[in-house]
Swiss-Prot record:
A GO BP annotation: regulation of mitotic cell cycle
Annotated spans, Disordered: 70-96
SUPFAM superfamilies: beta-beta-alpha zinc fingers
Predominant localisation class: cytoplasm
Composition-biased stretches (Basic and acidic residues): 85-96
Keyword check for Acetylation: no
Gene3D superfamilies referenced in this protein's UniProt entry, alphabetically: Classic Zinc Finger
Subunit structure: Interacts with MET4 and MET28.
MF (Gene Ontology): cis-regulatory region sequence-specific DNA binding; DNA-binding transcription factor activity, RNA polymerase II-specific; RNA polymerase II-specific DNA-binding transcription factor binding; zinc ion binding
InterPro entries in UniProt: Znf_C2H2_sf, Znf_C2H2_type
UniProt subcellular location: Cytoplasm; Nucleus
Keyword Glycoprotein: no
Lineage: Eukaryota, Fungi, Dikarya, Ascomycota, Saccharomycotina
Gene name, Swiss-Prot/TrEMBL: MET32
Name used for this protein in its record: Transcriptional regulator MET32
């Protein structure tokens, strides 16, 4: 199989050299193959494969067998700088991307990143007063409140812990209110 691949690559290289010298004497099948290669290269323009230099100004890709004719007058492009800050990532369309430090999620707005980062808190700030389930966002708590899941969780809590659960939930709710007041006070004094 390797001998066939080597023979094919040799024939293709010779055909490309012939193409670069005189386009009129090319087999129509070779012309079609070259058009396909050019179209594929246009689609994959951003991806630059590692090329192995060969004779006659022809480069052959070591992985995919792609063939590329070198232009003698082409100047090498300067290497791109990789000095990008983690917060200043940009996608292919040029818009900024904000990456979460704890997981691999990326967001197009910094506000979305801040909202997402709350999900990584050890103690979630919004606690359901009925079942004790914690939520990172208030809107998620509102959606959850008094749903079948909430009632099921409450039933499980009551059967597992008895009536002492109500007292525990009140303490959690009270400490949550105090925690929010402290955060609001600290945030307003820094502004």
């Amino acid at each position: 199989m390797e001998d066939q691949d080597a023979a094919f690559i040799k024939q293709a290289t010779e055909a490309i050299v012939d193409v670069s010298l005189n386009i009129d004497n090319i087999d129509p099948i070779i012309k079609e193959l070259l058009e396909r290669v050019r179209n594929r290269q246009n689609r994959l323009q951003n991806k630059k494969p590692a090329l192995i230099p060969a004779e006659n100004g022809v480069d052959i890709n070591s992985q995919g067998g792609n063939i590329k004719v070198k232009k003698e007058n082409a100047l090498p492009k300067p290497p791109k700088s990789s000095k990008s800050k983690p917060q200043d990532r940009r996608n292919s369309t040029g818009e900024k991307r904000f990456k979460c430090a704890k997981c691999s999620l990326e967001f197009s707005r910094s506000s979305d990143l801040r909202r997402h980062e709350k999900t990584h808190f050890a103690i979630l700030p919004n606690i359901c007063p009925q079942c004790g389930k914690g939520f990172a966002r208030k809107d998620a708590l509102k959606r959850h409140y008094d749903t079948l899941t909430c009632r099921r969780n409450r039933t499980k809590l009551l059967t597992a812990g008895g009536e002492g659960i109500n007292e525990l939930l009140k303490k959690v709710k009270q400490s949550n209110i105090v925690h929010r007041q402290d955060n609001n006070h600290n945030g307003s004094s820094n502004g």
